[in-house]
Amino acid sequence: LSEWALVYENYDPGQERLREALCTLGNGYFATRGAAPEAVAGEVHYPGTYLAGGYNRLRSEIAGQEVENEDLVNLPNWLPLTFRIDGGDWFDLEQVQILDYHQSLDLHRAVLERSVRFADAEQRISRLSQRRLVHMGMPHLAALATTLVAENWSGSVEFRSALDGRVVNDGVARYRGLGNRHLEPLRVEEHDSETLFLKMRTTQSRREIALAARSRLYLNGEHQELQPECERKPDYIAHHFRLDMTEGDTLRLEKCVSLYSSRDRAITECGTDALNTLHRAGTFEELLASHSEHWLQLWRRFDIGIGENNGEQGERHALILRLHILHMLQTSSP
C-alpha cells in the first residue's frame, strides 16, 4: 500500500470499468478514461475521451414519443495501439496466460502505468510495459509510451496505432435505447510516415474535433524510420508498422496526440493547430518531465497530509484523499 499510488496486482474483467473510471487522466480541457490501449468497447471495457463543454443533442423515438437528450460526447479514441507476432491474433489480455500483472496510477505525477508479463498460445513469453499522461501544462497534448520485450522468442512484430472516430455514447445501460452516435466524419489523412490526422464533427452542436497522432518506434533505443502501411476508413485511420525482433530485444513505441476543437480560443483552424502543436511536441520523456513538474507545483499547494505513524489505515486514508484531490485538480485545471 502506498499513499501516492493506486495499485492493482491482478486483471479482473468484472472490475475493469470501475478501474477505468478511477484511473482517468485529464487536465481540465479533456480527459481520457483509463482503458487499456488495446481495449475495444463492450461489456468489459469502455474507452472514452471527453472535452470540457463538448455537448451534443440527439432526438430518439421511445414508446412512440420523441425524446431529446443531451450528452457529453465520447470523442474519437486516441488510444488504440496493439500488436501481433508473426501475423497471429492481435494482443488480447483475455486470450493469453498472464504471468505477472501490475497497474498503477501514480498520483504524484498523474501517470498511469501498466506492466504485463504473458505467454501466448505458442508459449512465447513477452513483457509489455506502458505509461500514459494527459499533459497538465500543455492542455492539448497526451502521450503513451509502450515497450515490448521478447523474452524467449524471435519473429516479426506488427504494431497498429490508430485514431478511431467510430465511437458512440454507450456507457450507461439504461440509456442504450436513446440515440448515441454524436459524431460524423469530416476528414482522415496520413500526414507523413509517423503522423495521422482525423477530424470529426458533432451532429447538432456542429463542433469540429481534430486529432493528430505521431507514432515513433525505437528498437533497442535506436529510432526506426519505417514506411508503414496506412489503413483508412471515413472515420478511422491507422498505421501498421512491421519489423523483426530477436530474443532479448526491446521495442518501444511512443504515441503523442494533439486534440483541438473548433470552439477553442485564439486558434486559426482546429486541424491546423492540432498538427502544428504535435510537430512542436517533444519526446515522451520530455513531455513526462514537464508534466511532472506541473504536478509537483500543484501538490505543493494542494496536498493535505494525515498525521504520521497511523499505520496501514492511515496510508489508505491518505491515498483516498489524494485520489479525490487528483481528480478535482484534473477537472478544475488550476
Model-based region annotation:
Residues L1-P334:
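Acidic/polar, glycine-enriched structural segments that form the non-catalytic walls/loops
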